[in-house]
Amino acid sequence: MTKKNTLLLIDGYGFVFRAYYAQQPLTSPKGEPVGALYGFTSMLLKLLNDFKPKHAAVVFDSGGKNFRHEIYPEYKANRPPPPEDLIAQLPLVRDVARNLNFPILEKNGFEADDIIATFAAKTASIGEEVVVISSDKDLLQLMNDNVKIYDPLKAKYITEDNVVEKFGVTSDKLREVMALIGDKSDNIPGVPSIGPKTASSLITQFGTVENIFNSLEQVSSIKQRETLQNSKEAALISWQLIGLDYNVDMDFKLDALEWSPPDHNKLTEFLHEYGFKSLYKRAENLFDIKISEHKEVIEEKAVEIKDISNKAELEAFAEKAKKVGIFGIYILQNKGANIAFILSLKNQAYIIKISNEANNLFTYNSKADNEWFTDIIFNLLTDQSIKKITYSLKPLLKFYASRAQQITAIEDLELMNYALSAGLPQKNLFEAVEKEATIEEAAKIVVGFIDLYQQTILELKDNKAFRIYKEIDLPVCFVIDKMEKAGIKVDANYLNQLSSEFGAEILKLEEEIFVLSGMKFNIGSPKQLGEILFEKMQLPFGKTSAKANSYSTGADILEKLSEQGYPIADLLLRWRQLTKLKNTYTDSLPKQIDNITRRIHTTFLQTSTTTGRLSSQEPNLQNVPIRSGEGNKIRQAFVAEQGYKLISADYSQIELRILSHIADIKALKQAFINKDDIHTQTACQIFNLQKEELTSEHRRKAKAINFGIIYGISAFGLAKQLNVSNTEAAEYIKKYFAEYKGVQEYMEATKSFAQANGYVTDFFGRKCFVPLINDKRLKQFAERAAINAPIQGTNADIIKIAMTLLDREIEKRKLKTRLVLQIHDELLFEAPIDEIETIMPIIKQIMENSTNMDVPIITEIRAGNNWMEIH
């Protein structure tokens, strides 16, 4: 964000040309080229978001000749004309600026550089600050205390040190050096054979070009002296050409350049007209508006939808796809079962009905009715020269079962959108048609895949999210698919036995509860339980919920009753714990064992969290309890196949290590570098004790403080967790911030950034949106989420990178070891016993070195027969 009256001066055509060459070709709904316009619009939106200026202007060249051509007719004579598709867009660039409500500055006979110089000088003369947005080196001459240069290509302010490093002189001497060097792009001659090093040396010695020629005899090199003597006129002309005109005759009123948000309707119409749908969300977030959905442009065109029912028709499509080099593909599902393949080219959709009654991972293409099309499509999917665009890649990978890993050159629109907007509602393109299983309507959406891909890939690059998508999210999707197909073995007999044990104890607990309450009732009914506790038994803490019109019987109430010595509360808490474990795990897991593989195959969701974390469902194997004896008994049910062992590789204190790096907490960094026990160190500082004086309770509390701080815990929350007073908890937090200087500053800076931008970023640049950050009712929750998101997001991306690298290494070595589960910080492998000694060091080395940070990343790794043994 800029200072109050800062003027932002934007080099218009500099942006437009950069946008054109940086973007892939893009056409509007009318078929006109708009790639440069899209890039220019995206760049201006980014500037508004990053700088939030009060005053701003986009400055354009007027075209034609100017005073420099009078000095030197060959000025810019060598420049080739712009490409034809760019020329067609140039008259429209001012519309982009106008629709974003930017004032425009231009004047016949003057270049944008001179107008920028004039307005920068006049603004600085009244004591206000100027930020020039340009990558043009000529404008570096303007740098001073009041005029800053921001290079959008490098996304940073240019400093005097940067200028000295590149040109050997400070900005006030840049004109002199550049006059000697010349500029081929503008056909400015300079002095032959004099480069930056020689030029800076001469200017350092003589001060100006004029002084060099006034003191030529003092130039020590005879060859340089002769060259200079022969090029005096060229050097002096170059000096005039490179200099900026600070006195362009234009009215200057800073107030006239005040920027205000654009007209909602005009902006909406503009974005619709040019088909910039991928910019809607950014415009909505930036200007706090809602852009209404126009009817899809693709539906307005004549969309041809054909059924493909035989091999010859599909082969004809394949030939077309090979010629154009790109096509859309989607598997339409209804209640999890595949019902159609939909293929698309521009304005054409092709439907192949799938004969598949069974809804099973391993029987998707087993029916003879499907054989005629599966191989032809597979050949297209594995052709590196043809790009495939899909939405939700995993059903396609499931369809091709063991052959899925050969699929290449494929892009996933769902993952692309997630890389742009984690934390915002993820719109399912096919939600409506999947409910109704309307194949024709789905086909119309698939027809738009190619255009949507071309727009979204540009937005990924504009938002610096391309690497996140291409190097993290897309490759790990293939690894997740393999992991889901591998599944994990569970001992069903053991779970049934455990379920019986839990059931017996539950019955015993129920009898004791009924005795204490004096009657039988439905313990699982909060309403009945509340009436028993607070009406019949007259226990304290009874409060009714206005919405439910019943007593609150949550864990917090039962824990309060337990602290007051009411034995029924302990029995109820234990009953709830056991019934949840029985219902969720010991009863449920055996029912979810696949009939073919005899293993459990969970589904990992890749786009459901704010931070990039994976989540698990059907069943959720990431929430298997760990901190209780019963939880460990359940983990004992997860076993290795005969002749195999399970390997657990778990990142140690990864979130604290990430915090130390991204917040630059020197005390934390040093502790990790020294391999100190961080919880012991924290305990010593918080409780003012020596290491030998600490108890396990001190360390437990320190651990809770360390990890609680990461999640933005309040004094109240910490007090409850540690069972201490609010005052004591507040003192712990105060001491923590004093010991680990920088943590509190990081938290405040992160909250401020989130409030200003609506998102935070992780170590890799992933944007984690926090849409509720400015909602007064949910502000504290959103602030805690904002503080933790960069840490949790970095953690998630580190382990996803490691998963991909490990998968590649296992494939390269042709090992039988396979990844079977990901549980946030932990990876669980199943390995043949004879591969254990080989694979364990590989896993540890790759996990610890997948990302470079200022502190070591440590992995704890163990092998055993079941999950409990190794955790």
Curated annotation (Swiss-Prot):
Residues 1-283 form the 5'-3' exonuclease domain. Its EC number is 2.7.7.7. It comes from the Bacteria. GO terms for biological process: DNA-templated DNA replication; double-strand break repair. GO terms for molecular function: 5'-3' exonuclease activity; DNA binding; DNA-directed DNA polymerase activity. InterPro entries: 5-3_exonucl_a-hlix_arch_N, 5-3_exonuclease, 5-3_exonuclease_C_sf, DNA-dir_DNA_pol_A_CS, DNA-dir_DNA_pol_A_palm_dom, DNA/RNA_pol_sf, DNA_polI_H3TH, DNA_polymerase_1. The keyword Transferase applies. Disulfide bonds: none annotated. It is an enzyme of class 2 (transferase). The keyword Ribonucleoprotein does not apply. SMART domains: 53EXOc, HhH2, POLAc. Pfam families: 5_3_exonuc, 5_3_exonuc_N, DNA_pol_A. It catalyses: DNA(n) + a 2'-deoxyribonucleoside 5'-triphosphate = DNA(n+1) + diphosphate. Belongs to the DNA polymerase type-A family. Single-chain monomer with multiple functions. In addition to polymerase activity, this DNA polymerase exhibits 5'-3' exonuclease activity. This is DNA polymerase I. The gene is polA.
